[in-house]
Amino acid sequence: MNNAEWANKDYYADLGVSKNASAEDIKKAYRKLARENHPDKNPGDKVAEDRFKKAAEAYDVVGDETKRREYDDLKKLLASGGIRGGFGSGGADFPGGFRSTQGFDASDLFGGAGPGGGFSADGGLGDIFGGIFNRGSSPRQSARPTRGADVETDITLEFREAAKGTTIPVELTGEAPCNTCHGSGSASGQPSKCGQCNGSGFTSENKGAFGFSAPCTNCGGTGEVITDPCVDCRGRGTVRRTRSITVRIPAGVEDGQKVRLAGQGEAGPNGKPAGDLFVRVHVKEDPVFEREGNNIHVTVPVSFSELALGGAISVPTLDKPVKLKLAPGTPDGRTLRVRGRGVETRTAKGDLMVTVQVTVPPTLSDEAAEALRTYAEAEKKSGFDPRANWAGNNR
């Protein structure tokens, strides 16, 4: 669709709502129309298909807060006579007493208005037309990159490395500053001022009664040109090579998290700043520890006697093992907290959560078996019944 045709649309009427309708009413109206006229519900019905498309187009504009505001501003401008003669040839009046008396086609304000940049008429028309219709400059007139490209890479860490933090070498292949010209692109090391824009980076163009500015096509908006290109980089200021950098991974990084290193991406052209490096971290599973937030969980096998009689057990941590005291009668599956032994970040420190789990010996020595039989008799005499309060007794 031609951009100028968009301005002649009545999107509110297409949705069957008033211009003052709330966002919720607009959404409800669109959903109702979309449901009633959906192609799947009306196979072969061209009228329903057209209604469906019109509703979708309308909702795309007035269903978006920013686009709706720009659309409303444009319609108000047209209704007030701010642009007369419609979107064909003829004169045009603009707010602020500014008038075009020459043969002016208002459609020039849209896609064919000339290269991007600021529209000089009062009233913010550049914002209105440029925003809703996405008018922009052509590729050949757009400014050159002002920084290097961002780079992404992946690394894999052990569980402890991610929890405690580490440094790791990373090898990257991409654009790096040319060593011969030190990134300037010029053999002399000093680019020259662009003669076409006089170093400003922009040129002006008059279209009828209106003035437009655009990035200079000679220097790409930089204000500088290379008159003596470096033989090694051919004036780009960068060459492709492999480099190795050391990446510091902060403590507490999680699986899938990205670490940003500013200025460590690809070098910018002709001395422009480098892009950023984003390192995506993958964390291996650990056979002992599991992480939940900043807390670390570990399950420790224990014997029945250790739980029944109490005592101290050795528990692994991210650093070195610690002793954990068990009270007599600690139940199987109990989770105990060791404070401050979890993952430590810049803002918080987690705990170590220790779950004790009874392990039954697969075989017993004669001495151990006799001791257990003696214990079993004593247990009965003491009146202990592990199923005394069990709900299953009533089934």
Swiss-Prot record:
Residue numbers binding Zn(2+) 1: 178, 181, 230, 233
Compartments, record wording: Cytoplasm
One BP term from GO: response to heat
CXXCXGXG motif repeat intervals: 178-185, 194-201, 216-223, 230-237
UniProt key word Oxidoreductase: no
Record-linked CDD domains: DnaJ (cd06257), DnaJ_C (cd10747)
Keywords of the record: Chaperone, Cytoplasm, DNA replication, Metal-binding, Repeat, Stress response, Zinc, Zinc-finger
HAMAP family in the cross-refs: DnaJ
Domain notes per entry: The J domain is necessary and sufficient to stimulate DnaK ATPase activity. Zinc center 1 plays an important role in the autonomous, DnaK-independent chaperone activity of DnaJ. Zinc center 2 is essential for interaction with DnaK and for DnaJ activity.
Role summary: Participates actively in the response to hyperosmotic and heat shock by preventing the aggregation of stress-denatured proteins and by disaggregating proteins, also in an autonomous, DnaK-independent fashion. Unfolded proteins bind initially to DnaJ; upon interaction with the DnaJ-bound protein, DnaK hydrolyzes its bound ATP, resulting in the formation of a stable complex. GrpE releases ADP from DnaK; ATP binding to DnaK triggers the release of the substrate protein, thus completing the reaction cycle.
Record protein name field: Chaperone protein DnaJ 2
Organism in which the protein naturally occurs: Corynebacterium efficiens (strain DSM 44549 / YS-314 / AJ 12310 / JCM 11189 / NBRC 100395)
Gene assigned in the entry: dnaJ2
